[in-house]
Amino acid sequence: MSALPKLPQTSPDARTAPRPVLRVRGMRADDLDAVMQIESAIYPFPWTRGNFADSLTAGYDAWVFAAAEGAGRELLGYAVVMWIPDEVHLLNLSVAGAMHGRGIGRAMLDWLMRDAWRRGARGMMLEVRPSNQAAIALYRNAGFAQIGVRKRYYPAPHGAREDAWVMFRRLDDE
Ligand SMILES: CC(C)(COP(=O)(O)OP(=O)(O)OC[C@H]1O[C@@H](n2cnc3c(N)ncnc32)[C@H](O)[C@@H]1OP(=O)(O)O)[C@@H](O)C(=O)NCCC(=O)NCCS
């Protein structure tokens, strides 16, 4: 994933708030305003609108997650997944800042892993910044292990670069 992580802006009571029931559907071009609003708020180095548009054009799996009840069309999160024959590469996993720490990221990741497994993928790979402690905790708790490092992969403040950890999890029917 290409953006510099920020620790989630979690309010003190966020983790005790109930996780909304999520519904998922494919991302469409008319979601991009809402997606970019979230993306630019949670990443110092966000994907551009063009990155998302290109992902849709390329036929990557792109999903948006919203509350099943109440909040209407308001997006809570989104993800982009690229298939590489029998594995998937998680390119973007993002939750709206105000909703961090409520179990939404984990629920989205679990759904993505199940969906990929059902459709024939037997592994999921991703890149993450070593400084992104929330994301690393999420992935480790979900069964991912670090399998490599890509040196100076991400942009960082003041023209610096940050490594990426490559993490992988075999998918199964659990
Ligand atoms: C990373 C992200 C997707 C996690 O989503 P979330 O909905 O906030 O996370 P969840 O509430 O589902 O928590 C899942 C696990 O992540 C970890 N986690 C979440 N927030 C954390 C924090 N602030 N500090 C440390 N660990 C944290 C915990 O292990 C948690 O599981 P547990 O509480 O059951 O042990 C979300 O914070 C986000 O969108 N961040 C900005 C974008 C980003 O960095 N995306 C990932 C790029 S690789």
PLM regions and their residue ranges:
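Acetyl-CoA-dependent GNAT
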Residues: 2-8, 17, 26-100, 106-119, ...
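Flexible coil/turn residues that form the inter-helical turn or adjacent wing/linker of helix-turn-helix
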Residues: 45, 122, 160
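Conserved catalytic-core motifs of GNAT/GCN5-like acyltransferases
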Residues: 2-3, 125-127, 140, 145-165
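Short, contiguous pre-domain boundary segments
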Residues: 15-21
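Conserved glycine-rich acetyl-CoA-binding loop
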Residues: 96-110, 117-119, 123, 129-137, ...
